[in-house]
């Protein structure tokens, strides 16, 4: 702990991810005992991601939000090729878009937040596209970063509105997190999902 206190347990269950657990939460000796040090040498970081958090000024019923998640894949479906293309060209088509409708799935949502709904839109993003801002601070990354986020946001909204066009006039809040946001808040080195 930051105050020097050490917590021990015979069994550790971590939701921080195996790499973060082994490299930041365990001592090197404990990571070796658990067989994680050798295993991690063979494991790459998971994909970094972008997440668009959307708030709508209408309830899920009015918006006709589905209670299932959407997975959108381009018609030319070769995931590896699309992912590779997107990693080289940030303007290439997104290789996958995942859309979730939390407000429609929570039976208590309408009671707790009347007249409001949320949607999340997620896709992969190469961490390297954000390394120019690696040494900057959250909310202080500069105009170029904000312009990049705005362009990505518009592209992601465009895909969402192809699937759910009725949402467009009701948008009230929109915020995009990047791999740097995930790094900042979750301490995942490469903004992994």
Residue ranges: model-predicted function:
Residues 1-112:
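Mid-domain catalytic core of redox enzymes
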Residues 19-24, 55-57, 113-155:
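Conserved FAD/dinucleotide-binding core of flavoprotein oxidoreductases
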Residues 27-29, 136, 177:
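Short Gly/aromatic-enriched secondary-structure transition segments
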Residues 57, 61, 106, 128, ...:
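Short secondary-structure junctions and interdomain/linker hinges
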Residues 75, 104, 126, 176-178:
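Residues that form or immediately flank small-molecule/cofactor binding pockets and catalytic motifs
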Residues 81-82, 102, 116, 128, ...:
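Flavin (FAD/FMN)-binding glycine-rich loop and adjacent Rossmann-like elements that form
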Residues 94-98, 158, 162-193:
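A glycine-rich dinucleotide-binding beta-alpha-beta segment and adjacent secondary-structure elements
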């Amino acid at each position: 702990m930051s105050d020097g206190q050490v917590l021990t347990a015979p069994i550790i269950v971590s939701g921080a991810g195996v790499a973060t657990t082994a490299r930041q939460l365990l001592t090197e000796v404990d990571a070796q005992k658990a067989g994680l040090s050798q295993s991690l040498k063979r494991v790459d970081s998971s994909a970094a991601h972008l997440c668009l958090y959307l708030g709508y000024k209408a309830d899920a019923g009015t918006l006709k939000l589905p209670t299932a998640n959407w997975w959108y894949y381009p018609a030319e479906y070769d995931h590896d090729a699309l992912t590779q293309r997107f990693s080289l060209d940030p303007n290439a088509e997104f290789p996958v878009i995942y859309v979730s409708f939390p407000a429609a799935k929570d039976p208590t949502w309408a009671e707790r937040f009347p007249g409001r709904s949320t949607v999340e839109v997620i896709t992969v993003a190469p961490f390297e596209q954000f390394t120019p801002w690696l040494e900057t601070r959250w909310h202080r990354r500069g105009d170029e970063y904000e312009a990049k986020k705005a362009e990505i946001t518009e592209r992601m909204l465009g895909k969402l509105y192809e699937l759910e066009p009725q949402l467009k006039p009701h948008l009230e809040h929109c915020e995009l997190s990047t791999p740097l946001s995930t790094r900042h808040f979750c301490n995942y080195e490469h903004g992994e999902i």
